[in-house]
Amino acid sequence: MSTPYKLGAERHESIYTNKIAARYLPRSKPQEQPTAVITGGQPGSGKSSLTALAVNQFRDSGYVLVDADKLRPFHPDYRRLMRTDDRNAANLTHADCGPWANRLLRDGVEGRRNIIIDQTSRDPEALAKMTVGLRQAGYRVELHVMAVAAAVSEQRIHERYEGQKEASGFGRFSTKDKHDEAYAGVHATVGAAERGNLVDRLVLYDKSAQPIYENRLENGAWRSAPGADQAMKAERTRPMTLQERREYAAGFDALADKLARPERKATPEEVGRIAEMQRNARSLLAAEVFRQEKPEAAMRQFPELATAYANVRAIEAKTNSERLTAQQRETVMARVRENVAASIERGDAAKVVRAEPERVSHRSQERDLKR
């Protein structure tokens, strides 16, 4: 693969020695028992909040921060690339920034400094290799990971990008394939870390950076039965609350407004992608409003729900005409309402609901024939 922006060896070395090492290494002091904090999470998950927590953890002893993204501005071509091709600037400079980060880690370990390694941790084998090396060097190793739903982190990627682009004319973007690869890889890493006793402490956090799971090694065994894999899956896949859906929909409304501004010069593809996500977010919100709020309030927010409510009433009338107990009618209507809500989430409520009266009628006819 061609690397046209890779620096010559002398320039590469000079920048590391005179700028990177000179800036990062003096911020810490050697430790008798050094600690390495490794972060994890797909792009947009909020890993920066974990770095902030680690910085506070090391406020007295200092630390060496290892983060290739933080080193990119040291590359002489990076800012120009950000102005002309901000979505690929990171990849185009990684031939230098990756080795700089690795060397900074090596120098920090040799100096027995506390270390914060800000990364996605999407590769279980790479994490295992890193933790083995750190432990052999006398480090206590912690893994702190964001357990965040893919929908939330995807939205945050766009919000970060648009915010940076609005402020400075360019922004840092993560492509969907990179996001999805990391999303799957981080989960695999968490499970491998706990199964293999790869770290001394493992902490999972929700999207607000609140801890939801913690386990520690004590005398070579986990203090609690391993459950990080299940905890991460549960948090990532739990349904959004009504308030979370409101915030999610509002986020895409704001993004759509940003892209609509003439000075943004958004491409049709960018506008279309956000519009699609905006529609999906609105459908998710409408479905939860349908589930939780009274029809009058729901239709004030989403007038298009009127058809769904009308069809539900028709099904209810049909059900009431059949020889069902009150409990049976309640069970049927609960199932109907949830099916309608699921259809609203998919954006095809009217089409799906219209079929329900026919199914109810068909079941009634079958019972009549059996009598």
Regions found by a protein language model. Give the residues of each.
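N-terminal pre-Walker A segment at the start of P-loop NTPase domains
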Residues: M1-K29
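The conserved Walker
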Residues: Q42-P43
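Conserved lysine of the Walker
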Residues: K47
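Hydrophobic positions on the alpha1 helix immediately C-terminal to the Walker A/P-loop
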Residues: L50
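Conserved nucleotide-sensing/catalytic segment adjacent to the nucleotide-binding pocket
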Residues: D60-V66, K70-V132, A137
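A glycine- and Lys/Arg-enriched "phosphate-lid" helix/loop adjacent to the NTP-binding pocket
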Residues: Y139-G185
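Small-molecule kinase domains that catalyze NTP-dependent phosphoryl transfer to phosphate-bearing small molecules
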Residues: G171-R216, A231-A234
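Extended intrinsically disordered terminal tails
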Residues: Y213-R371
